[in-house]
């Protein structure tokens, strides 16, 4: 596990303790009881692919530990509207405060502004956060295999499904993938960014794609910048993408999405 990930996870444990002191778990559980149905994140991804289209998870991200502030003029609702207009299948919203300058409020603002399913992009390590995600209005959570033991993966994914949330299980290498496929969820993300060096190579996805079961949706994450990158992935039957920084640096994120995925020469 990388030093930065260790640092984030240590902080996340403290954050869960702080939040549960303010809003007890019992209160979150009660609030999660009679919520509206989620929007169906995995189903939306599968429907896009079945229609022959790329399934794009468009990320709403202000900053990152490696790049600092990516989008100074950060308006989550406007970004969400732009993404929906540009053809996104789903959204990913960063809610980590300390390392990504995210916010729970950003998720609410983005989701309220559109009809797309939304992933809560955070470092989920505790059942408290799963209930919290459901109460916030998320439709999907992220589980990072390198941050969790097998028992945690099973427990957190099981709880998420019980609450009606989809789960994106993220891996970076073949050992993590072997663990991920034991989790009975349809979405497996391959992060092309090495969290130890922050180097990005699309070859990571291509080297591992054949080991992903055919009944799962493989989502390639990080490093998709050009139409050639998209074509390279789709030529290898990789049809689901999570893209953030490329869009966040554009004046109109949704137009950037449309140009990257849907503009044909």
Curated annotation (Swiss-Prot):
UniProt superkingdom: Bacteria
Cited SUPFAM superfamilies: Ribulose-phoshate binding barrel
Record InterPro entries: Aldolase_TIM, Indole-3-glycerol_P_synth, Indole-3-glycerol_P_synth_dom, Indole-3-GlycerolPSynthase_CS, RibuloseP-bd_barrel
GO molecular function, one term: indole-3-glycerol-phosphate synthase activity
Family annotation (PROSITE patterns): IGPS
Recorded catalytic activity of this chain's protein: 1-(2-carboxyphenylamino)-1-deoxy-D-ribulose 5-phosphate + H(+) = (1S,2R)-1-C-(indol-3-yl)glycerol 3-phosphate + CO2 + H2O
EC numbers, comma separated: 4.1.1.48
Alphabetized CDD domains for the sequence: IGPS
GO terms (BP aspect): L-tryptophan biosynthetic process
Pathway in which the depicted protein is active: Amino-acid biosynthesis; L-tryptophan biosynthesis; L-tryptophan from chorismate: step 4/5
Swiss-Prot/TrEMBL keywords: Amino-acid biosynthesis, Aromatic amino acid biosynthesis, Decarboxylase, Lyase, Tryptophan biosynthesis
Family, similarity comment: Belongs to the TrpC family.
NCBIfam families in the record: PRK00278.1-2 (NF001370), PRK00278.1-6 (NF001373), PRK00278.2-4 (NF001377)
PANTHER family, per database record: INDOLE-3-GLYCEROL-PHOSPHATE SYNTHASE (PTHR22854:SF2), TRYPTOPHAN BIOSYNTHESIS PROTEIN (PTHR22854)
Protein name as annotated: Indole-3-glycerol phosphate synthase
Gene: trpC
